[in-house]
């Protein structure tokens, strides 16, 4: 239900809203009309400026919160912005559109993706799902899997989608290049599998939304009319399709505020286009530029070192960070000949600090850029008997047991996802062989249906034999869960799946430590589900799965 906005009931004095900001921050927060580029150096208080700008729009300018959109790059940043705005304004913060690019696109597509030929009940595939499709495509095209590996191929497809190049266009651009021609075939097969499964990948969320807005003037105008004031954080990290999305939505009122720092652009390998921020004034005529150069996080010695390094960039917007935090300690720079020499010296320095009583091991941390760099440090820690803990590892949602239960939930929610059905049909083991699954897949293909639909018609398929009863048992169990899903929340449904399928019993057959770890992960998953339902009124299983998909692959 849309909130009725009556700003005159509680409007604050402008000085109350902006009094905690420095003069330049105030300038940025109070500039509300037309395109605005806020060049925000590291530690310069950009989130503070954005949240106060939103509060200023509502309380001073009388803008309806419903008409404000703030785009972030992570769910964590979106939640932080929501919380801060909620503390600043007395009413209406819940109506502000604060979300990531991907969450925003899901929100739009859930309403209108049927205009593009999809069912609104679509599934969002994660990286593992994508790799499975690539392997299938490579096999069906009879290509060498060693020459056409999933990771690089997904990179090619993602790069194409980020540049809004769809399969047919990619094929045209391939020309006579043999490798590109094969990649075009894989891309085409990959996209067909997604469409057949009523599924999208993360790049599709953006690409399909842009296509939807371009092809449907009524939808575009509706969002332009609603989202009259748009703010985008980390603008230096936007790619071509994200730029086009923002350009389209801001096309009527032109009240676009972007915050970023070209000096912090490090995601070119993910498709980020630095020209989006460098050419902002040319792209949006009449744009104002405000520079936030006062740093609140570091000392001047650190900032001068950073300024000296970044000054070597050939193409950048001039800015010079400074601080009132004093000079601080001098920055040391040490060059090592080898990775092992570096690790040896770093571990020796840590041991010296500990032996002198200045620190404990738990006070020390080693940061590295790539996972491969950890090996040298780990080996030196072991050699010198230094206790350590490696932070990171497997993403929670990529763990086998979590993927299994997610596949159950997806199958219960929608039987159109063949990957999920294939994953769980023998989890726990049901004795359904690959030959049987192949026959089901052939039947499904010949009759233009999904795998689960073929399973429902198993009695009509010749050559299945005794396996038919096992298939019917699986189908019946899913149908029971579907009925339960109408009455239970996701946490309760997970509990039923674990108990009724015998999944927990299978875990108990594993080694004690391994079984316990998996059980704890499943309990944590149930807790996450319970928390989601507690914080979202009228939440449905589809909503929870959407939340998991966005959190798992974005953050």
Q: Residues of each region from the PLM?
A:
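A basic/glycine-biased coupling hinge at the interface between accessory DNA-binding modules
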Residues: 2-11, 15-16, 33-36, 41-44, ...
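N-terminal pre-P-loop "Q-motif" helix
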Residues: 18-32
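Conserved helicase motor core of SF1/SF2 NTP-dependent helicases
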Residues: 44, 232, 236-315, 319-324, ...
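Short alpha-helix plus adjacent loop in nuclease-associated cores
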Residues: 104-112, 263-270, 297-298, 391-413, ...
């Amino acid at each position: 239900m849309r909130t009725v906005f009556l700003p005159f009931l509680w409007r604050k004095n402008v000085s109350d809203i902006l009094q905690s900001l420095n003069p330049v921050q105030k300038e940025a927060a109070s500039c509300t009309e037309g395109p605005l580029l806020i060049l925000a150096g590291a530690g310069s208080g950009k989130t503070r400026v954005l949240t106060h700008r939103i509060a200023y729009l509502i309380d001073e300018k009388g803008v309806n919160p419903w008409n404000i959109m703030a785009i972030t790059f992570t769910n964590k940043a979106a939640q932080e912005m929501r919380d801060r705005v909620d503390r600043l304004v007395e009413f209406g913060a819940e109506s502000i559109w604060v979300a990531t690019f991907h969450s925003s696109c899901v929100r739009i597509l859930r309403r209108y993706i049927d205009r593009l030929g999809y069912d609104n009940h679509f599934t969002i595939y994660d990286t593992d799902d994508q790799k499975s499709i690539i392997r299938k495509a490579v096999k069906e095209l009879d290509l060498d899997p060693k020459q056409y590996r999933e990771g690089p191929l997904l990179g090619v497809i993602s790069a194409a989608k980020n540049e809004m190049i769809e399969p047919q266009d990619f094929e045209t651009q391939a020309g006579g290049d043999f490798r590109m021609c094969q990649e075009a075939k894989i891309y085409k097969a990959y996209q067909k599998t997604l469409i057949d499964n009523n599924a999208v990948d993360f790049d599709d969320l953006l690409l399909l939304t842009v296509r939807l807005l371009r092809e449907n003037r009524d939808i575009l105008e509706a969002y332009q009319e609603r989202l009259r004031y748009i703010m985008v954080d980390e603008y230096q990290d936007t790619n071509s399709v994200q730029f086009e999305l923002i350009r389209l939505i801001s096309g009527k009122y032109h009240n676009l505020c972007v915050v970023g720092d070209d000096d912090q652009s490090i995601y070119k390998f993910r498709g980020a286009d630095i020209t989006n921020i460098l050419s902002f004034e040319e792209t949006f005529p009449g744009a104002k530029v405000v520079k936030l150069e006062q740093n609140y996080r570091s000392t001047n010695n650190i900032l001068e070192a950073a300024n000296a390094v970044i000054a070597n960039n050939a193409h950048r917007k001039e800015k010079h960070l400074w601080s009132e935090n004093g000079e601080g300690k001098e920055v040391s720079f040490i060059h090592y000949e080898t990775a092992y020499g570096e690790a040896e010296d770093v571990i020796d320095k840590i041991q010296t600090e500990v032996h002198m009583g200045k620190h404990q091991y738990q006070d020390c941390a080693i940061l590295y850029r790539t996972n491969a760099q950890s090996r040298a440090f780990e080996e030196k820690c072991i050699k010198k008997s230094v206790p350590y803990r490696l932070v990171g590892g497997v993403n929670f949602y990529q763990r086998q047991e979590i993927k299994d239960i997610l596949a159950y939930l997806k199958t219960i929610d929608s039987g159109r996802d063949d990957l999920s059905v294939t994953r769980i049909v023998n989890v726990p083991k049901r004795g359904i062989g690959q030959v049987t699954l192949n026959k089901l897949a052939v039947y499904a293909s010949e009759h233009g249906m999904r795998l689960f639909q073929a399973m429902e018609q198993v009695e009509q398929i010749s050559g299945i034999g005794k396996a038919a009863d096992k298939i019917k048992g699986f189908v019946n169990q899913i149908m029971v869960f579907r009925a339960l899903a109408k009455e239970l929340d996701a946490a309760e449904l997970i509990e039923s799946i674990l108990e009724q399928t015998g999944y927990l019993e299978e875990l108990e057959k594993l080694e004690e430590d391994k079984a316990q770890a998996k059980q704890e992960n499943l309990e944590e998953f149930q807790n996450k589900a319970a928390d989601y339902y507690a914080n979202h009124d009228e939440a449905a299983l589809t909503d929870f799965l959407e939340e998991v998909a966005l959190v798992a692959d974005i953050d």
